[in-house]
Design a protein with these regions (language model features):
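Structural signal for conserved beta-strand scaffold positions within catalytic alpha/beta enzyme cores
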Residues: 1, 102, 151-153
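Residue-level recognition of specific faces of alpha-helices
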Residues: 37, 83-86, 99, 130, ...
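ATP-dependent small-molecule kinase phosphotransfer cores
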Residues: 2-92
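Generic alpha-helical secondary structure signal
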Residues: 7-14, 105, 109, 133
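NTP-dependent small-molecule kinase module
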Residues: 108-166
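Short beta->alpha linker loops
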Residues: 3, 41, 65, 105-106, ...
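Conserved phosphate-donor/acceptor-positioning beta-strand/loop module used by diverse small-molecule
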Residues: 62-64, 93-114
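A generic structural signal for alpha->beta connector loops
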Residues: 57, 97, 146-149
C-alpha cells in the first residue's frame, strides 16, 4: 500500500507500514496523520514522476493511485472523506487516470496469501471485515464511473488477466 517511485515517497511509505507501527509499538499515528503521510508520498510521486512523464506525453501505469487512498483510508479506516478529497484536488490539479483496473478478489483466499507472506507489514494484519469494506469501496467507486473502471475477476489465471488488460 502507498505511493512508490521516488526515494522520498518510499521513505514516507516505510514510515507508515513498517515495524514500528506493529501492535507492540509505543508510537502510533492517528488516522489523519497516517493518511496525510500517504498523501504527502502521493504528492511527491505526482511531482517527481507523473508530471514529468505527462509533460513528455508518456503512457503511465500506476500500481495504486487515488482510489486506493479512498478505499483504504476513507472506507476502510473511516478517515474524513472531505479531507482526502481536498488534498487530492490540490495535489492532482487536472491530472486524472484514463483507465482503472480493479481486481476483485476472494477475500478468504487473499487473507490466506497474506498469512503465508514471509515479510509482513501492518496492512497484512487487518481483519477480514476491513478487507471486505475496502473491496466494496473499490466496487462502489467503479460503479460511479463505469466508463473509466474495469472490474476483473482475480480468481482467473494471471495470464488471462494480463491479456484482458492488454
Amino acid at each position: 500500500p502507498g505511493p512508490r517511485g521516488t526515494k522520498t515517497a518510499e521513505k514516507k511509505r516505510e514510515a507508515i507500514v513498517e515495524d514500528y507501527f506493529h501492535a507492540d509499538s509505543k508510537e502510533k499515528f492517528n488516522q489523519d496523520t497516517d493518511t496525510l503521510l500517504y498523501l504527502a508520498a502521493r504528492n511527491q510521486h505526482i511531482e517527481k514522476k507523473l508530471k514529468p512523464a505527462i509533460f513528455k506525453k508518456k503512457i503511465i501505469i500506476c500500481d495504486r493511485f487515488i482510489d486506493s487512498t479512498l478505499a483504504y483510508q476513507v472506507y476502510g479506516k473511516g478517515v474524513n472523506k472531505s479531507l482526502v478529497d481536498s488534498v487530492h484536488k490540490y495535489i492532482l490539479g487536472n491530472i486524472k487516470p484514463d483507465l482503472t483496473f480493479i481486481l476483485k478478489v476472494n477475500i478468504s483466499k487473499a487473507l490466506q496469501r497474506l498469512k503465508n507472506r514471509k515479510r509482513k507489514n501492518r496492512y497484512d494484519r487487518f481483519s477480514k471485515n476491513f478487507y471486505v469494506k475496502v473491496q466494496n469501496a473499490f466496487l462502489k467507486i467503479a460503479r460511479k464511473n463505469q466508463n473509466r473502471y474495469f472490474v476483473l475477476d482475480n480468481s482467473k489465471d494471471s495470464n488471462v488477466i494480463e491479456k484482458t488488460i492488454l
